[in-house]
Regions:
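Conserved P-loop NTP-binding catalytic core
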Residues: 44, 50-58, 62, 72-135
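C-terminal lobe/lid and adjacent interdomain/linker elements of RecA-like ASCE P-loop ATPase modules
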Residues: 6-11, 17, 343-447
Length: 447
């Protein structure tokens, strides 16, 4: 496949984001020298440099370790880039940090810029975009926010860098992406681009887009909008189907969803969408038909929670596989049988089906995926939180050496080793004393 048809995430970095105090990099690049499960790695060459990219990753860690914060940070960066500024918004995202940015800084830090860095491949270009935001302290609503630093690189060459001033190198941008006649009066163009730039606005989506390279910025924004799908709360997904001939009370059978649900073991004859009488929306519904009953019911009333959840998530999987891109989901596997998810993982590892090299990233508590026959060591990620500093740390199983007391050897039982705390990112939990105290007091647990 040509590079132009591939859209992949290479890495994502953060600093001073919620529980992540220090700079942390989440990598989707294959670890050097690691062998095995090569079918889950694909190669992309950009400007003569070969990149070995992972097609999946699973993230482990105890409750409150920061797993969701890592995924939430991807969502926040996406929202900021698409909005083009760092002002609060009332758009109602489930990720409150995307709406209320004073929730972002690590508690206890002062005057430390929050960092977001992302590196991805789109249309044969290696794109790296970095923003550092001065957001003040945690919950500081009155702080005058500003962009501390902003850098765009294409194929490892700096296109622009913004600090106190902005330096633009349009010679590092292919001519086809530049605005017409921009090179005829570059100094005047720079002055116009910088003069109207507010401190809380991104140069990328404002002056750089308007004055220098509209087509390049459109390409970047397209990746964030359509190729990076971050589901911060996967239990909240409600897919709405649009139809050109929408009629009230009409039932639209969805063959694909029905086939998927039958693999799951649904009780109804078919799944589809029924048009609401009150609005121009549709409701996922089950059709029940036998010799005694003929009815259409909302699927949430009739099917199991896990079935409805999987059916709502499945269109996202289809879209990623058909169009390419990166699908990131918080607790993707909750209420879904692990065998179903294992099949999805294997599909992302299958070049005959995953022809556009889509990527799947999710966090989980289910240890069944700690399997050397399912995931490579560099695809198994961990997040743990220090009990003293309350800061999160992220690492991969491939970061461990292959020898020594905590070494990870080929063919080992990853699940067993995880539960004996060989890899960290696990916490002993014992509610016995709390419950004994409550019971001994006759159930009175008032403080």
């Amino acid at each position: 496949m040509k590079n132009g048809g591939v859209f992949v995430l290479l890495s994502f970095g953060i600093r001073n984001y919620k529980s992540f105090k220090e700079e942390t990099v989440f990598s989707m690049t294959a670890a050097p020298k690691q062998k095995g499960l090569d079918y889950s790695v694909f190669e992309q060459t950009v400007s003569g440099k070969k990149h070995r990219v992972l097609s999946s990753a699973v993230i482990y860690g105890p409750n409150a370790s920061g797993k969701t914060n890592l995924i939430g940070a991807m969502d926040v960066m996406k929202e900021i880039v698409l909005r083009g500024h760092i002002r609060n918004t009332n758009e109602g995202s489930l990720n409150q940090a995307a709406n209320t940015l004073e929730l972002i800084p690590f508690r206890g830090t002062k005057n430390v810029p929050t960092l977001f860095n992302i590196k991805f491949i789109e249309q044969g270009l290696l794109i790296e975009y970095t923003i550092e935001l001065q957001l003040g302290s945690f919950l500081d609503k009155e702080f005058d926010r500003y962009i501390h630093n902003e850098t765009l690189k294409i194929n490892d060459a700096i296109v622009y860098e913004r600090g106190k001033d902005v330096a633009v190198n349009i010679e590092n941008v292919k001519t086809k992406y530049l605005n017409d006649k921009i090179d005829q009066n570059i100094e005047s163009a720079k002055e116009i681009a910088f003069s109207g730039l507010n401190e809380d606005e991104l140069f990328l989506t404002n002056g750089f887009k308007t004055i220098f390279a509209k087509d390049l910025v459109s390409l970047i924004l397209n990746w964030f909008q359509n190729k990076l799908t971050v589901i911060y709360r996967s239990d909240s997904i409600r897919m709405l189907r649009e139809y050109s001939d929408l009629e009230s009370k009409k039932f639209y059978i969805e063959k694909t969803l029905t086939d998927v649900a039958k693999e799951f073991g649904i009780h109804s004859n078919a799944l589809g969408y029924i048009a609401s009488q009150e609005s121009e929306t549709t409701v996922l519904s089950s059709i029940i038909k036998d010799e005694n009953v003929k009815a259409v019911l909302p699927a949430e009333m009739y099917e199991s929670y896990g079935t409805v959840r999987f059916v709502n998530e499945f269109p996202l999987i289809i879209d990623a596989l058909i169009n390419g891109g990166t699908l990131v989901m918080d607790e993707f596997d909750a209420s879904i049988h692990p065998m179903a998810l294992m099949n999805i993982i294997n599909i992302f590892h299958n070049d005959d089906i995953n022809i556009h090299h889509a990527q799947l990233i999710f966090n989980t508590h289910n240890p069944i995926f700690l399997n050397a026959n399912l995931f490579r060591r560099d695809e198994i990620k961990f997040v743990e939180r220090d009990d003293t500093t309350h800061a999160s740390e992220h690492y991969s199983l491939s970061d461990f050496k292959t020898f020594g007391e905590r070494g990870v050897r080929k063919g080992e039982d990853y699940m067993k080793n995880y539960f004996v705390n060989q890899y960290g990112a696990i916490k002993d939990v014992d509610f016995s004393s709390i419950l004994e105290s409550i019971i001994s007091e006759g159930g009175n647990n008032d403080s």
